Amino acid sequence: MLFLQLPLLLVLLPGGDSEEGFQEPISFQIIWISSFYNRSWEEEVCSAWLGELQTHRREGKSDIVIYRQPWSKGNFSREDLMESEHILRMFFVRFVQAFFNHASQWKLEYPFDVQIAGGCDLYHGETSVGFVRIAYQGSDFASFQNNSWLPSPKGGTRAQLVCKLFNLYQGTLEIIHKLLSDTCPRFVLGLLDAGKADLQRQVRPEAWLSSGPNPSPGHLMLVCHVSGFYPKPIWVMWMRDEQEQPGTQQGDILPNADGTWYLRVTLDVAAGEASGLSCRVKHSSLGGQDIILYWEQHSSVGWILLAVIVPLVLLTGLAFWHRKHWKHCDPSSALHRLE
Protein backbone atom coordinates (compact mmCIF):
# COMPACT_ATOMS: atom_id res chain seq x y z
CA MET A 1 0.00 0.00 0.00
CA LEU A 2 3.00 2.29 0.50
CA PHE A 3 3.39 3.19 -3.18
CA LEU A 4 -0.27 3.47 -4.22
CA GLN A 5 0.04 7.26 -4.14
CA LEU A 6 3.43 7.37 -5.89
CA PRO A 7 2.15 7.60 -9.52
CA LEU A 8 -0.05 10.58 -8.60
CA LEU A 9 2.77 12.38 -6.82
CA LEU A 10 5.08 11.74 -9.77
CA VAL A 11 2.58 13.39 -12.10
CA LEU A 12 2.50 16.42 -9.82
CA LEU A 13 6.25 16.83 -10.07
CA PRO A 14 7.88 18.93 -12.83
CA GLY A 15 8.08 16.87 -16.00
CA GLY A 16 5.89 14.16 -14.50
CA ASP A 17 3.15 14.58 -17.10
CA SER A 18 5.35 13.25 -19.89
CA GLU A 19 6.84 9.89 -20.68
CA GLU A 20 10.31 11.39 -20.29
CA GLY A 21 9.46 12.54 -16.79
CA PHE A 22 8.99 8.96 -15.59
CA GLN A 23 12.39 7.79 -16.75
CA GLU A 24 14.27 9.47 -13.93
CA PRO A 25 13.79 8.29 -10.33
CA ILE A 26 13.07 10.64 -7.45
CA SER A 27 16.17 10.58 -5.30
CA PHE A 28 16.50 11.50 -1.63
CA GLN A 29 19.87 11.30 0.08
CA ILE A 30 21.69 12.34 3.20
CA ILE A 31 25.27 13.47 2.60
CA TRP A 32 27.63 13.33 5.56
CA ILE A 33 31.23 14.56 5.31
CA SER A 34 33.77 14.11 8.09
CA SER A 35 37.28 15.56 8.13
CA PHE A 36 39.72 13.82 10.48
CA TYR A 37 42.64 16.10 11.33
CA ASN A 38 44.39 14.07 14.04
CA ARG A 39 43.66 11.39 16.66
CA SER A 40 41.25 13.62 18.57
CA TRP A 41 40.05 16.34 16.21
CA GLU A 42 37.28 15.76 13.68
CA GLU A 43 34.80 18.11 11.99
CA GLU A 44 31.68 17.20 10.10
CA VAL A 45 28.80 18.61 8.09
CA CYS A 46 25.56 16.88 7.16
CA SER A 47 22.80 17.79 4.70
CA ALA A 48 19.81 16.14 3.02
CA TRP A 49 18.64 16.60 -0.57
CA LEU A 50 15.52 15.83 -2.57
CA GLY A 51 16.99 15.73 -6.04
CA GLU A 52 19.03 18.95 -6.20
CA LEU A 53 16.90 20.77 -3.61
CA GLN A 54 18.35 20.93 -0.11
CA THR A 55 15.77 19.99 2.52
CA HIS A 56 17.81 19.68 5.73
CA ARG A 57 21.17 20.72 7.14
CA ARG A 58 23.14 20.16 10.33
CA GLU A 59 26.26 22.15 11.10
CA GLY A 60 29.12 20.60 13.03
CA LYS A 61 28.22 18.20 15.82
CA SER A 62 25.13 20.11 16.87
CA ASP A 63 21.97 18.07 17.43
CA ILE A 64 19.91 20.86 15.85
CA VAL A 65 18.55 20.02 12.41
CA ILE A 66 17.83 23.02 10.18
CA TYR A 67 14.74 22.53 8.01
CA ARG A 68 15.50 24.35 4.78
CA GLN A 69 11.97 24.13 3.34
CA PRO A 70 8.59 24.80 5.02
CA TRP A 71 7.61 21.21 4.17
CA SER A 72 10.91 19.55 5.14
CA LYS A 73 9.27 17.53 7.93
CA GLY A 74 7.02 15.79 5.42
CA ASN A 75 4.11 14.11 7.15
CA PHE A 76 6.19 12.47 9.89
CA SER A 77 5.06 13.09 13.44
CA ARG A 78 7.37 14.76 15.93
CA GLU A 79 8.04 11.38 17.52
CA ASP A 80 8.89 9.79 14.16
CA LEU A 81 11.31 12.61 13.34
CA MET A 82 13.01 12.45 16.73
CA GLU A 83 13.41 8.67 16.49
CA SER A 84 14.86 8.80 12.97
CA GLU A 85 17.23 11.65 13.85
CA HIS A 86 18.39 9.78 16.97
CA ILE A 87 19.12 6.59 14.99
CA LEU A 88 21.08 8.51 12.35
CA ARG A 89 22.99 10.48 14.96
CA MET A 90 24.03 7.29 16.80
CA PHE A 91 25.08 5.68 13.52
CA PHE A 92 27.36 8.59 12.60
CA VAL A 93 28.82 8.79 16.14
CA ARG A 94 29.76 5.10 16.07
CA PHE A 95 31.05 5.43 12.53
CA VAL A 96 33.42 8.24 13.54
CA GLN A 97 34.53 6.34 16.62
CA ALA A 98 35.35 3.27 14.52
CA PHE A 99 37.63 5.32 12.27
CA PHE A 100 39.36 6.84 15.28
CA ASN A 101 39.84 3.47 17.01
CA HIS A 102 41.11 1.63 13.94
CA ALA A 103 43.04 4.38 12.15
CA SER A 104 46.35 2.66 12.82
CA GLN A 105 45.11 -0.83 11.89
CA TRP A 106 43.54 0.46 8.67
CA LYS A 107 46.68 2.52 7.92
CA LEU A 108 44.78 5.81 7.73
CA GLU A 109 47.05 8.83 7.48
CA TYR A 110 45.87 12.11 9.01
CA PRO A 111 44.39 14.31 7.75
CA PHE A 112 41.79 12.43 5.73
CA ASP A 113 38.16 12.83 4.65
CA VAL A 114 35.33 10.31 4.70
CA GLN A 115 32.02 10.87 2.89
CA ILE A 116 28.77 8.93 3.21
CA ALA A 117 25.78 9.26 0.87
CA GLY A 118 22.72 7.28 1.89
CA GLY A 119 19.06 7.37 0.89
CA CYS A 120 16.63 5.90 -1.60
CA ASP A 121 15.45 6.25 -5.19
CA LEU A 122 11.71 6.03 -5.92
CA TYR A 123 10.66 4.77 -9.34
CA HIS A 124 7.36 5.04 -11.18
CA GLY A 125 7.07 1.26 -11.25
CA GLU A 126 6.14 1.30 -7.54
CA THR A 127 9.63 0.29 -6.45
CA SER A 128 12.19 1.80 -4.13
CA VAL A 129 15.93 1.16 -4.12
CA GLY A 130 17.95 2.11 -1.04
CA PHE A 131 21.65 2.86 -1.09
CA VAL A 132 24.58 3.76 1.14
CA ARG A 133 27.96 4.58 -0.36
CA ILE A 134 31.20 5.43 1.43
CA ALA A 135 34.07 7.36 -0.11
CA TYR A 136 37.56 7.79 1.31
CA GLN A 137 39.56 10.80 0.13
CA GLY A 138 36.99 11.28 -2.63
CA SER A 139 37.29 7.75 -4.08
CA ASP A 140 34.81 4.87 -3.92
CA PHE A 141 35.45 2.84 -0.79
CA ALA A 142 32.46 0.67 0.18
CA SER A 143 28.70 0.27 -0.30
CA PHE A 144 25.75 -1.37 1.45
CA GLN A 145 24.19 -4.10 -0.71
CA ASN A 146 21.97 -7.07 0.15
CA ASN A 147 22.11 -6.25 3.87
CA SER A 148 25.90 -6.23 4.10
CA TRP A 149 28.89 -4.00 3.42
CA LEU A 150 30.87 -4.67 0.25
CA PRO A 151 34.33 -3.19 -0.40
CA SER A 152 34.99 -1.27 -3.59
CA PRO A 153 37.83 -2.52 -5.80
CA LYS A 154 39.38 0.94 -5.49
CA GLY A 155 39.36 0.62 -1.70
CA GLY A 156 41.87 -2.21 -1.67
CA THR A 157 42.79 -4.07 1.52
CA ARG A 158 41.78 -1.11 3.68
CA ALA A 159 38.16 -1.27 2.45
CA GLN A 160 38.09 -5.03 3.00
CA LEU A 161 39.13 -4.59 6.63
CA VAL A 162 36.52 -1.88 7.23
CA CYS A 163 33.69 -3.96 5.72
CA LYS A 164 34.77 -7.02 7.70
CA LEU A 165 34.39 -5.06 10.93
CA PHE A 166 31.11 -3.38 9.98
CA ASN A 167 29.54 -6.71 8.97
CA LEU A 168 30.09 -8.09 12.49
CA TYR A 169 27.31 -5.87 13.87
CA GLN A 170 24.16 -7.68 12.75
CA GLY A 171 21.86 -5.37 14.68
CA THR A 172 23.24 -2.32 12.89
CA LEU A 173 22.87 -4.03 9.51
CA GLU A 174 19.18 -4.68 10.24
CA ILE A 175 18.62 -1.06 11.28
CA ILE A 176 20.24 0.20 8.06
CA HIS A 177 18.08 -2.16 6.01
CA LYS A 178 14.91 -0.87 7.69
CA LEU A 179 15.92 2.76 7.18
CA LEU A 180 16.52 2.19 3.47
CA SER A 181 13.58 -0.07 2.68
CA ASP A 182 10.86 1.43 4.89
CA THR A 183 11.68 4.71 6.64
CA CYS A 184 13.27 6.46 3.65
CA PRO A 185 10.52 5.79 1.06
CA ARG A 186 7.80 6.69 3.57
CA PHE A 187 9.55 9.94 4.39
CA VAL A 188 10.08 10.82 0.72
CA LEU A 189 6.40 10.26 -0.07
CA GLY A 190 5.57 12.62 2.79
CA LEU A 191 7.96 15.24 1.39
CA LEU A 192 6.43 14.96 -2.08
CA ASP A 193 2.94 15.35 -0.68
CA ALA A 194 3.72 18.22 1.71
CA GLY A 195 5.86 20.09 -0.82
CA LYS A 196 3.89 19.48 -4.00
CA ALA A 197 2.92 23.17 -4.32
CA ASP A 198 6.60 24.13 -4.52
CA LEU A 199 7.78 21.06 -6.41
CA GLN A 200 5.25 21.47 -9.22
CA ARG A 201 5.95 25.20 -9.55
CA GLN A 202 6.43 26.33 -13.15
CA VAL A 203 8.28 29.56 -14.00
CA ARG A 204 8.68 30.61 -17.63
CA PRO A 205 12.20 31.40 -18.83
CA GLU A 206 13.33 34.69 -20.31
CA ALA A 207 15.73 34.46 -23.25
CA TRP A 208 17.90 36.97 -25.09
CA LEU A 209 20.83 36.97 -27.51
CA SER A 210 24.19 38.68 -27.40
CA SER A 211 27.59 38.38 -29.02
CA GLY A 212 30.60 37.22 -27.06
CA PRO A 213 34.31 37.88 -27.65
CA ASN A 214 35.26 36.91 -31.20
CA PRO A 215 36.96 33.50 -30.94
CA SER A 216 39.14 34.13 -34.01
CA PRO A 217 39.38 36.55 -36.96
CA GLY A 218 36.35 36.32 -39.20
CA HIS A 219 34.32 34.41 -36.61
CA LEU A 220 31.47 35.37 -34.28
CA MET A 221 30.53 34.00 -30.88
CA LEU A 222 26.73 33.84 -30.69
CA VAL A 223 25.39 33.68 -27.14
CA CYS A 224 21.88 32.62 -26.11
CA HIS A 225 20.98 33.48 -22.50
CA VAL A 226 18.08 31.75 -20.73
CA SER A 227 17.22 32.78 -17.18
CA GLY A 228 14.53 32.67 -14.51
CA PHE A 229 13.19 29.19 -15.30
CA TYR A 230 11.96 26.49 -12.93
CA PRO A 231 12.16 23.52 -12.74
CA LYS A 232 15.75 22.91 -13.77
CA PRO A 233 15.39 20.54 -16.78
CA ILE A 234 15.59 22.58 -19.98
CA TRP A 235 16.60 22.15 -23.64
CA VAL A 236 18.38 24.97 -25.48
CA MET A 237 19.95 24.62 -28.92
CA TRP A 238 21.26 26.77 -31.75
CA MET A 239 19.36 25.83 -34.92
CA ARG A 240 19.44 26.45 -38.65
CA ASP A 241 15.89 25.87 -39.83
CA GLU A 242 15.09 22.54 -38.12
CA GLN A 243 18.68 21.33 -37.94
CA GLU A 244 20.51 21.33 -34.62
CA GLN A 245 23.94 22.91 -34.85
CA PRO A 246 26.57 20.41 -33.65
CA GLY A 247 28.92 23.16 -32.51
CA THR A 248 26.49 24.30 -29.80
CA GLN A 249 28.23 24.56 -26.42
CA GLN A 250 26.13 24.49 -23.25
CA GLY A 251 27.46 25.86 -19.99
CA ASP A 252 26.51 24.74 -16.51
CA ILE A 253 22.98 25.43 -15.32
CA LEU A 254 23.53 27.93 -12.51
CA PRO A 255 21.20 28.92 -9.66
CA ASN A 256 19.69 32.38 -9.36
CA ALA A 257 19.12 33.96 -5.96
CA ASP A 258 15.34 33.41 -6.19
CA GLY A 259 15.63 29.65 -6.69
CA THR A 260 15.28 29.75 -10.48
CA TRP A 261 18.02 28.81 -12.95
CA TYR A 262 20.24 30.40 -15.61
CA LEU A 263 21.88 28.84 -18.68
CA ARG A 264 24.26 30.19 -21.33
CA VAL A 265 24.56 28.44 -24.71
CA THR A 266 27.10 29.53 -27.32
CA LEU A 267 27.96 28.86 -30.96
CA ASP A 268 31.18 29.74 -32.80
CA VAL A 269 30.42 30.49 -36.48
CA ALA A 270 32.04 32.19 -39.43
CA ALA A 271 30.77 35.76 -39.73
CA GLY A 272 29.14 35.06 -43.08
CA GLU A 273 27.25 32.03 -41.77
CA ALA A 274 25.37 33.69 -38.89
CA SER A 275 22.40 34.50 -41.10
CA GLY A 276 19.55 32.02 -40.69
CA LEU A 277 20.57 30.85 -37.21
CA SER A 278 18.18 30.85 -34.26
CA CYS A 279 18.18 29.81 -30.62
CA ARG A 280 15.34 27.48 -29.58
CA VAL A 281 14.27 26.94 -25.96
CA LYS A 282 12.08 24.08 -24.73
CA HIS A 283 10.80 24.03 -21.14
CA SER A 284 7.91 22.43 -19.29
CA SER A 285 6.51 25.86 -18.36
CA LEU A 286 6.05 26.83 -22.03
CA GLY A 287 3.25 24.38 -22.73
CA GLY A 288 4.84 23.20 -25.96
CA GLN A 289 5.24 26.76 -27.31
CA ASP A 290 9.00 26.94 -27.79
CA ILE A 291 10.87 30.23 -27.54
CA ILE A 292 12.66 30.94 -30.84
CA LEU A 293 15.04 33.90 -31.16
CA TYR A 294 16.52 34.75 -34.58
CA TRP A 295 20.01 36.16 -34.86
CA GLU A 296 19.04 38.48 -37.74
CA GLN A 297 16.44 40.17 -35.54
CA HIS A 298 19.01 40.60 -32.77
CA SER A 299 21.44 42.18 -35.25
CA SER A 300 18.70 44.42 -36.68
CA VAL A 301 17.71 45.60 -33.22
CA GLY A 302 21.35 46.36 -32.48
CA TRP A 303 21.68 48.50 -35.60
CA ILE A 304 18.39 50.27 -34.87
CA LEU A 305 19.50 51.10 -31.34
CA LEU A 306 22.83 52.29 -32.67
CA ALA A 307 21.08 54.45 -35.27
CA VAL A 308 18.94 56.05 -32.56
CA ILE A 309 21.54 56.43 -29.82
CA VAL A 310 24.35 57.93 -31.91
CA PRO A 311 22.28 60.90 -33.24
CA LEU A 312 20.93 61.52 -29.73
CA VAL A 313 24.45 61.66 -28.32
CA LEU A 314 25.54 64.02 -31.11
CA LEU A 315 22.52 66.30 -30.63
CA THR A 316 23.07 66.39 -26.87
CA GLY A 317 26.71 67.33 -27.35
CA LEU A 318 25.82 69.99 -29.91
CA ALA A 319 23.19 71.51 -27.61
CA PHE A 320 25.67 71.59 -24.73
CA TRP A 321 28.27 73.29 -26.95
CA HIS A 322 25.78 75.93 -28.16
CA ARG A 323 24.66 76.64 -24.61
CA LYS A 324 28.22 77.07 -23.42
CA HIS A 325 29.14 79.20 -26.45
CA TRP A 326 26.05 81.43 -26.04
CA LYS A 327 26.82 81.99 -22.37
CA HIS A 328 30.29 83.30 -23.21
CA CYS A 329 28.89 85.58 -25.96
CA ASP A 330 25.82 86.88 -24.03
CA PRO A 331 25.97 90.78 -24.04
CA SER A 332 24.16 90.99 -20.68
CA SER A 333 26.93 88.92 -19.11
CA ALA A 334 29.50 91.35 -20.49
CA LEU A 335 27.58 94.35 -19.07
CA HIS A 336 27.48 92.77 -15.63
CA ARG A 337 31.22 92.28 -15.75
CA LEU A 338 31.72 95.98 -16.74
CA GLU A 339 29.61 97.17 -13.84
Curated annotation (Swiss-Prot):
GO terms for molecular function: endogenous lipid antigen binding; exogenous lipid antigen binding; lipopeptide binding. The chain crosses the membrane at residues 301-321. Residues 19-300 are extracellular. The keyword DNA repair does not apply. InterPro entries: Ig-like_dom, Ig-like_dom_sf, Ig-like_fold, Ig_C1-set, MHC_class-I_related, MHC_I-like_Ag-recog, MHC_I-like_Ag-recog_sf, MHC_I/II-like_Ag-recog. It is found in: Cell membrane; Membrane raft; Endosome membrane. Disulfide bonds join C120-C184, C224-C279. One of its GO terms (biological process) is adaptive immune response. SUPFAM superfamilies: Immunoglobulin, MHC antigen-recognition domain. Keywords: Adaptive immunity, Cell membrane, Disulfide bond, Endosome, Glycoprotein, Immunity, Immunoglobulin domain, Membrane, Signal, Transmembrane, Transmembrane helix. Its main location: membrane. Residues 322-339 are cytoplasmic. Residues 1-18 form the signal peptide. A D-galactosylceramide binds at F91, F92, V93, R94, F95. One of its GO terms (cellular component) is membrane raft. It holds the Pfam family C1-set. It is a single-pass type I membrane protein. Residues 185-295 form the Ig-like domain. During protein synthesis and maturation, CD1 family members bind endogenous lipids that are replaced by lipid or glycolipid antigens when the proteins are internalized and pass through endosomes, before trafficking back to the cell surface. PANTHER family: MHC CLASS I-RELATED, T-CELL SURFACE GLYCOPROTEIN CD1A. Heterodimer with B2M (beta-2-microglobulin). Interacts with CD74. Antigen-presenting protein that binds self and non-self lipid and glycolipid antigens and presents them to T-cell receptors on natural killer T-cells. This is T-cell surface glycoprotein CD1a. It comes from Sus scrofa (Pig). The gene is CD1A.
